[in-house]
């Protein structure tokens, strides 16, 4: 599959985005989430400085376009799940097959709960305008 760039929001909205069974559990901690949110904040500042053509590459996501029609995340699972949690908080109507994914591993379940709670707490300290800037950045600035 050829390489291409996409906004993170567009990628997360793909109906067939999936995590293969062989992937390791979701292990990102609050510290990783804090670093991610800080990176996005810096990208927002840069976007305000350089204008609407500015894009920030949040990292590489490797996806396998499977014969069964699914887009399996091969690399970048931790980052993309974390960003999906941010989207879910900022936009409660947000739907992604990824956020509907059933995680059977107890470590994954606990880290997802803990990280969502951290995201919620982090954003309670932010203004509504800042929350909107974050959501806009995920749609327009942040790409993979």
Q: PLM features: residue spans?
A:
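Glycine- and hydrophobic-rich flexible loops that cap the catalytic core of alpha/beta enzyme folds
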Residues: 1-144
